[in-house]
């Protein structure tokens, strides 16, 4: 009884594989009719794909067989229907590349055209804005750098003093809070 169930489930998968092969053959024929790819017989392609499916089900592959092969060997090992589709896709990609190159050329020409139109306007803008006008303020970079260094030294000294004062103030604040009740706690801002 288990054999009849296994055979029943195997038949739909074989039918599905045959249908997939037929679809691939039909797609290859469409491509060939459009002049998109060169390839072998679609009948031999479908029989090849059925044979490959049967071999894969019967024999498990060793790790060496699963290793990636060089690209040419991989393409040669594909069924004819797949090869036809790959070639058709390559040709379509070349067509897309040609269209994209044409677009880029036209886009560059359009940019150049409008840059030429903008040149007089940009010249007028430059004329109106002109060069920087002189002013009474002078930049004294050396003196500012010296002042900055002195200011930074003063800040570091103040920060060290504040760090020493903070722990003492916190300890005094917690001691005062313990002595007083919860209602006597007044924020520091309110005391000032």
Curated annotation (Swiss-Prot):
GO terms for cellular component: nucleus. Gene3D superfamilies: 1.20.5.1500. Residues 15-28, 40-55 have a biased composition (Low complexity). This is Nucleosome assembly protein 1-like 5. Residues 140-168 have a biased composition (Acidic residues). Its main location: nucleus. The keyword Ion transport does not apply. It is found in: Nucleus. Belongs to the nucleosome assembly protein (NAP) family. The keyword Nucleus applies. Keywords: Coiled coil, Nucleus. Residues 86-112 form a coiled coil. InterPro entries: NAP-like_sf, NAP_family.
